[in-house]
Amino acid sequence: YAKGVFDEFPNAKKYWDYRKMYDEMGKSIDGVIIATADHTHAIITADAMTMGKHVYCQKPLTHSVYESRLLTKLAASTGVVTQMGNQGASGEGTDLVCEWIWNGEIGEVTKVECATDRPIWPQGLNAPEKADRIPNTLNWDLFTGPAKLNPYNNVYHPWNWRGWWDYGTGALGDMACHILHQPFRALKLGYPTKVEGSSTLLLSACAPQAQHVKMIFPARDNMPKVALPEVE
């Protein structure tokens, strides 16, 4: 996956371990871009922020609510510039949705439905019972990072780690930040007051094949041209 970048920037230093990069280049870099697996986002981001480096971290920002709260506190205490890689937030479509709603062009919004075709990787699986040979191109210990060190299995790589709770956040964690961003921003939603969830068979190691989540958000302060009532 990195070959195109390596070919374009042949003189750039390359590292397997982000910690070694921080040790060797910490004094010569201003910021970092983090696009590793979900379960390593928080620890790499936290180390960078503690060093005073600005951070652009791919979505989902973290692997858990605790990690998100930790990074929020670090951002406030360090004062570094941070951004999450939610590319749709920078597009014209998001701005147009906000403009339409804030101008009252579609009236009060009381219900929003969002859907995705994800997962496009396997989910709803039991944990593998056997170990496979680790590919020569993969440092399994480094990939595992802060997660539990499971025996390597081909079900995890490439790409499919997204459906396994030790490494990924399932379809909801992978896509909700994209498809829910517009209503969150346009309707000025905060924290929900009620959350209900249902899914196909729940397993301890892997995300379900399908799920439905319902959230209720309280009314917000009205805007000049539109009211912001409770939203489902």
Give names to the regions the model predicted.
Residues 54-56, 61-142:
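A contiguous active-site-proximal alpha/beta segment in oxidoreductase catalytic domains
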